[in-house]
Amino acid sequence: MADIYPWQQALWSQLGGRAQHAHAYLLYGPAGIGKRALAEHWAAQLLCQRPAAAGACGECKACQLLAAGTHPDYFVLEPEEAEKPIRVDQVRDLVGFVVQTAQLGGRKVVLLEPAEAMNVNAANALLKSLEEPSGDTVLLLISHQPSRLLPTIKSRCVQQACPLPGAAASLEWLARALPDEPAEALEELLALSGGSPLTAQRLHGQGVREQRAQVVEGVKKLLKQQIAASPLAESWNSVPLPLLFDWFCDWTLGILRYQLTHDEEGLGLADMRKVIQYLGDKSGQAKVLAMQDWLLQQRQKVLNKANLNRVLLLEALLVQWASLPGPG
């Protein structure tokens, strides 16, 4: 079982010290802040035969079984493949587990992540377990996007917000996790991850700073008419679509903010500030607003794993982006 992260200590002191437990909890917050580690730590305490406020004892039979991955009263439900939905028959297996008697005579614990990966049928199948608790069972649901959950799911859980850690705590942790990276690089990684330290660590492993430099260089060449949309779109094959749409949404928002305030502060990372200012001065606000609306719609499709033609989607994005300067 994972240890909790330093920024979770205050939250754990609330959760771990409870004498009575609800049937279901929803831990929600941004991705990359350690909600899974917190849920696993809590699950271990709930299953432990000699629990303390700090967590599980780590020595009893239940803790030993959990460490070995063979605890009969612990059920983890997650997509069978990364980025795939949780299927209804997986949830039916969970329901079957919930109605069974605990084999060790204590409570049963279910960990489900991410809850938004359930489609409507899977979520409806889960509702029965949420509506009709069976024995001493605790369900721990984790969500990175709670707005995508059915209201009936959320209403049957005790909802616990897991906030983004402060920048100082995140940078301190990143400095230990990535000791070879200079402070400036860590700050850039944290900014690129939206302030989520675990996401920053993951993106570092994917070469996000190099990907960002490639994309920024391409955007500048596009605006200077040194490259066309089609070859540029193809050259970005290694850059994840969610990252691309996050960046373009941020840049478009920066353009709008600059048009309204002419404030050069708050325009994001230095690599795109001059481009944002240029587009803010040269683009019609209605055109920028239309671009932002389109980006947000497409970003949602990307996040929902819609079946999209990647190159055509990026070509459409780049054609619109290149047309921003000018009347309209």
From Swiss-Prot:
Gene3D superfamilies for this protein: 1.20.272.10, P-loop containing nucleotide triphosphate hydrolases
What is this enzyme's catalytic activity, as reactions? Answer: DNA(n) + a 2'-deoxyribonucleoside 5'-triphosphate = DNA(n+1) + diphosphate
Gene Ontology biological process terms in this record? DNA-templated DNA replication
Entry's Gene Ontology cellular component terms: DNA polymerase III complex
Q: What does this protein do?
A: DNA polymerase III is a complex, multichain enzyme responsible for most of the replicative synthesis in bacteria. This DNA polymerase also exhibits 3' to 5' exonuclease activity.
NCBIfam families found in the cross-reference section: holB, PRK05707.1
| Protein name per Swiss-Prot or TrEMBL | DNA polymerase III subunit delta'
What species does this protein belong to? Pseudomonas aeruginosa (strain ATCC 15692 / DSM 22644 / CIP 104116 / JCM 14847 / LMG 12228 / 1C / PRS 101 / PAO1)
Lineage, opening ranks: Bacteria, Pseudomonadati, Pseudomonadota, Gammaproteobacteria, Pseudomonadales
Gene designation per UniProt? holB
